Each structure stands twice: as C-alpha cells, then as structure tokens.
C-alpha cells in the first residue's frame, strides 16, 4: 500500500502535536506517525508546573492528550506506527512504516529523545524487573521498599521526589559532588526526609539477574576508589536522554552526540525536511520550547508548500 501526503510528522510529543495542530489548521492534512513512545517524554512525567497557561500546573499525560485532541479537531491524522526506513534523496520523500509506504512532500522530524541507560553488564537483563527509566510507570511496584535513583539533574530530582510516595527510602546517587538540577528542584529533594544523597559515587553493576529481580548494586566511590555492595529493590535512572535520530544517519547532519543539526531554527540540510523538539535541541529541552519549535517547523512547511506546491 502506498499514499502521498503534503506533510508527515514523525513523533507525537509536544513538538509533533504542535506541528500537527498548525499544519492541520493550514489545511495540509498532516499524518502523524506516533512512534515507539506516543506522547513523548511528557507522557512519562507527573505535574508540569512550567508550561504557561496552567497556574496550578497540569499532569504531563493530560497536557499531551489535550494537544493531540486539539490537533485532531482540525483534521490531523494519527497513526500507531513507527518509521523503519527513509529516503530523503528526492522529493516526494519516501518513508517506510513497516510494510506500508508513504510519500510526502515535506517531513517534520519530531522524534524526540529517549532515556539514557548506564550500560552496566546486567542492566538490560533486569529492565522490567527492578531497573527502570520511568518512575511514573514503575514506582508503584516498590511500595514500602528501599530504592535508588541515579543522576544529578532535574529528572533525577523529580523522580526521587515522586518515588517517595511509594518507597520507604530513596537514595539518590550522583557521580559528582555538585548538581546540575535547578535550585528549586534540588532543594525540594534535599528537604524531603525520605531522600538520602550519595555523591561522588558511580554504579558498576546491578544484582541479581539470576533471581530476575534487583537485590543490590555494586558501587564505587570515585574519590576513595572504595568498591562495595549496596542493597536496593530497584534502580531508577534519571540520567538524561539520547536523541532519536539514528534512522537519518548519512542523510541529515548530526552533532557529536547524535542531535540533528538545524540552521534558521528548524531547517535541516535537506530542503523540505525540518526538525524540531528534543531531537535537535540539546540546550533548552523544555516542553514549551519543543512546542515552539514544532510551530516553527509547521510554518516553514506552509511556506514551502506555498512556494513549491505538490
Ligand atoms: P540532564 O540535565 O542532562 O542531567 C543528567 C544527569 O545525569 C546529570 O547530572 C549527569 O551527570 C548524569 N549522568 C549522565 N550520564 C551519566 C552516566 N553515564 N552515569 C552517571 N550519571 C550520568 O538531564 P535531565 O535531568 O533529564 O534534564 C534534561 C532537561 O529537562 C533539563 O533542561 C531539565 O531542566 C529539563 N527537565 C525539567 C523538569 C521540570 O522542570 N519539571 C523535569 C525534568 C527535566 P553530570 O551532572 O555529572 O553530567
């Protein structure tokens, strides 16, 4: 099966939904490919307090759901699929969504970023068995247990604070002595009596894959070199994200960490292909900036379609 579109949007987080809303209102009938993590990072978060327009805050999943409904109201079409290959060498661009082929005059890449893992020898074997990158998804399973959160940024503070709802004790382990988290989120975590901080410490491995559950960690103090075991029932990672851009390798420019390179805000090196949100933004990475760049990409698509037609 094959079809031809004015615009396809890859990703359904803040940037993708906003691009969908704007291109739908421009009557371009966008197709949104939802991807592996529908709703993006906001769907895995709790209360969002810094998205303007919600004085009491709004739950992340609710915010993205609202955005989607708003885009759908103007005719955006959402498809549960993911991009398996892409050819940007000529227009219309060719996308494969599994066995399904889509040609499109323009492409908006809003594929976001996914959780980073530590790369421990037994980490992958224990995902879903006590190793997690999503406190909101998995916190509930550790009611009354002692757990560990890794990281020193806002994600780690947010996860640690959230997990105190369930856990009897949360140990936040960070590889340095200072934190990159915002002052307000760090202070909130520091004031929480259930959160204990372990700094200058790295995780070397997680036990015990033979039991199919997390029983403890092998830790190393980077200052003293001491290596020791630390009992815990869960390991939550809050160590940032990696951009979902591998599929465009060789066709679009990337920086050293794999973020798509853009000029004039959202233009890639291929005319008619735009990138927005966390897949191209290593600096701001906020819901509101992702939404803003989704709007920019949509306006560029409108201009492109006016100039080049179908
Ligand atoms: P981040 O700011 O990049 O922080 C990642 C943390 O993980 C850093 O402390 C880093 O340590 C640590 N880390 C990275 N790789 C590691 C490794 N291999 N081993 C051990 N530690 C490692 O990422 P983020 O916390 O996800 O935040 C990303 C952006 O989203 C930020 O702009 C943040 O403000 C925003 N955010 C906002 C909210 C909110 O406002 N509600 C919530 C979450 C995130 P180093 O410090 O040593 O590099």
Go through each PLM region and give its residues.
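A Rossmann-like FAD-binding core segment of flavoenzymes
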Residues: 71-90, 95-97, 101-103, 165-263, ...
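FAD-site-proximal beta/loop scaffold in flavoenzymes
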Residues: 119, 125-141, 238-289, 293-296, ...
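Glycine/small-residue-rich loop that forms an oxyanion/phosphate-binding "nest" at active or ligand-binding sites
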Residues: 78-140
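Phosphate-coordination loops involved in phosphoryl transfer and adenosine-cofactor binding
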Residues: 4-6, 80, 143-145, 200, ...
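Beta1-alpha1 glycine-rich phosphate/pyrophosphate-binding loop at the start
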Residues: 5-74, 145-146, 157-183, 255
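Residue-level detector of alpha-helix initiation sites
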Residues: 13-14, 37, 113-115, 154-155, ...
């Amino acid at each position: 099966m094959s079809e031809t579109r004015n615009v396809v949007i890859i990703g359904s987080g803040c940037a993708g939904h906003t691009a969908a809303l704007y291109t739908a209102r421009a009557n371009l009938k966008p197709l949104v490919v939802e991807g592996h993590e529908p709703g993006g990072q906001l769907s895995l978060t709790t209360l969002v307090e810094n998205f303007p327009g919600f004085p009491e805050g709004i739950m992340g999943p609710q915010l993205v759901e609202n955005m989607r409904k708003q885009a759908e109201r103007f005719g955006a079409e959402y498809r549960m699929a993911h991009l398996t290959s892409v050819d940007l060498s000529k227009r219309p661009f060719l996308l494969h969504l599994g066995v399904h082929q889509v040609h499109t005059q323009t492409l908006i890449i809003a594929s976001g970023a996914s959780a980073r893992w530590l790369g421990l020898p037994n980490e992958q074997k224990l995902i879903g068995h006590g190793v997690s990158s999503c406190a909101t998804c998995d916190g509930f399973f550790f009611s009354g247990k002692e757990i560990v959160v890794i990281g020193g940024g806002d994600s780690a503070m947010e996860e640690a604070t959230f997990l105190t709802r369930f856990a009897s004790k949360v140990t936040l382990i960070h590889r340095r002595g200072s934190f990159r988290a915002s002052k307000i989120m760090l202070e909130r975590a520091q004031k929480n009596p259930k959160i204990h901080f372990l700094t200058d410490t790295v995780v070397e491995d997680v036990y015990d894959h033979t039991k199919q559950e997390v029983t403890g960690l092998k830790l190393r103090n980077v200052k003293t070199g001491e290596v020791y075991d630390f009992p815990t029932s869960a390991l939550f990672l809050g160590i940032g994200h990696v951009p979902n851009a591998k599929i465009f390798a060789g066709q679009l420019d990337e920086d050293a960490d794999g973020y798509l390179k853009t000029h004039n805000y959202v233009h890639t090196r291929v005319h008619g292909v735009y990138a927005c949100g966390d897949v191209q933004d290593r600096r701001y990475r906020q819901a509101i900036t992702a939404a803003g760049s989704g709007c920019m990409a949509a306006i560029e698509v409108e201009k492109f379609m006016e100039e080049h037609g179908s």
